[in-house]
């Protein structure tokens, strides 16, 4: 968990952890005097958090990896350290296994900008009373994204590269249906064959 103000840096609140209790304690420990800078470096926070997520994925190449950037703000970019276009390009050009979510609070937000940054999902709360529901909505979407990665292993008889394989995956969930199809050469594949 990182927090940001108008300074040209993200401040670490708590390192990456799977402990809900540890993360909750870190958030509960936030006080009103956490920052003395009243400005908002929103675009810088987007650029820097995207880089952190990219680096995390690059450091774990031996596993199926995904990351989520969840940005919570009650304002627009006031620091003018970075351009809006640079922040939106960071999101657009990011690794496709990074999901972007935004949560906006209050009347001083720019919903259009936040929807551009939160390309996976964006939610807005008019006041602090609506925040819990808003956070729960994003939490559910983050969990859905995290649970959408699968490892598929198949021992192809064409491991010598002598032909092309055609893979079709279909999914039906109630009335929802989806499919993806791809062709690949299995030269050197060993998954599922051992």
Model-derived segments and their meaning:
Residues 65-68, 96, 101, 148-150, ...:
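Envelope-exposed proteins and targeting segments
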Residues 1-3, 26, 68-72, 101-102, ...:
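Soluble periplasmic/extracytoplasmic beta-strand elements of cell-envelope proteins
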Residues 8-14, 28-39, 73-78, 101-102, ...:
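Second-shell loop/turn segments in exported
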Residues 44, 68, 72-126, 130-141:
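VWA/integrin I-like adhesion module and closely mimicked acidic/polar interface patches used
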Residues 51-63, 158-161:
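Surface-exposed acidic, glycine-flexible loop patches that form ligand/cofactor-binding
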Residues 121, 125-194:
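C-terminal "exit" segments of structured domains
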Residues 13-16, 20, 35-46, 62-65, ...:
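Solvent-exposed, acidic/flexible segments
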Residues 1-18, 45-46, 68-73:
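Von Willebrand factor
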